[in-house]
Amino acid sequence: MAEAKVVFLHGLHQRIVEAIISFNPAGFTTLVVDGKTAEAPQLEAVKDADFIMVFRARLSDQVLRAATQARLVQLLSAGYDSINLKLLRELNIPCANNGGANSRAVADHAVLAMLSLYRRVIAADRAVKDGRWAAAIDGMNSFEMADKVVGVLGFGNIGQKVARRVQAFDASVQYYDKYPLSPERERALNVRRVSLEELFRTSDIVSCHAPLTADTHHIVNAQRLALMKPTALIINTCRGPVVDEAALVEALQQKRIAGAGIDVFEQEPVDPGNPLLTLDNVVLSPHSAGTTWDTWFRRADFAYKNMRRVWDGQPPQAVATDYDL
């Protein structure tokens, strides 16, 4: 019986690549291709590929069209905004994300940002190292999570894990999602769905966990930021363009909201002139929320099992369905 051919297009360290392809199952062969190379090697590699596995490599339309035998594009990421889903639909090739494999890491990071802002961890660290001891903490500028309302924008795998984590700190959770949970599921998670406007108006923290689509582009805009409490925080660990960055900078500069935890930016790597870099009421990280050593094993395990499902004639799991990008 013929082996299934997987082409792995990536922009990763070799040690990570080796960890991922160690999950290659019997009956599969994986061809590793540097996703940062010229297009020609990619075109040659995919022409007889059964599966294309991708991380940190942008698939051009030409490469997708060349993959005439492909049964699935399998992403190792949660987001799918870098893939032309409309073209894949025309080509009848499904695209799957990582099935929540990095959801724990992203949820951890989102809560880390909340706590860092509330407890002024970065300012306190800097003060102690500078010999100013407790200069950053005056007894009036640090806060607890308990009894706060956390509004989760986008309530999929990551959003639901954020809910569980903040509830452990005795915060309550409300959410907005295009696709509401069943009443039974809401009761089980102890959450309630609210309108977008209510989410921004009544939350102490708004944490963004939506995919980037036409609907969610700049869903956090000047009008919605204006609804927020002056004591509120906004956290973004999903995709930069979900937040109108210029509007956010203005709200932060004018102290119309208290702070922001930002892992993703409209331009990445971030422009050295980005005003966010100059503000002391923000905590920033380099799109690293989902990138832990632990996640690679879950990503790889899910990806190869999903490709195996398709090879065995079953439908793939975690298929992206938003084609309005």
Report the location of each language-model feature.
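An N-terminal-biased, well-structured beta-alpha scaffold segment characteristic
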Residues: 2-96, 221
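N-terminal Rossmann-fold NAD(P) dinucleotide-binding loop
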Residues: 159-160
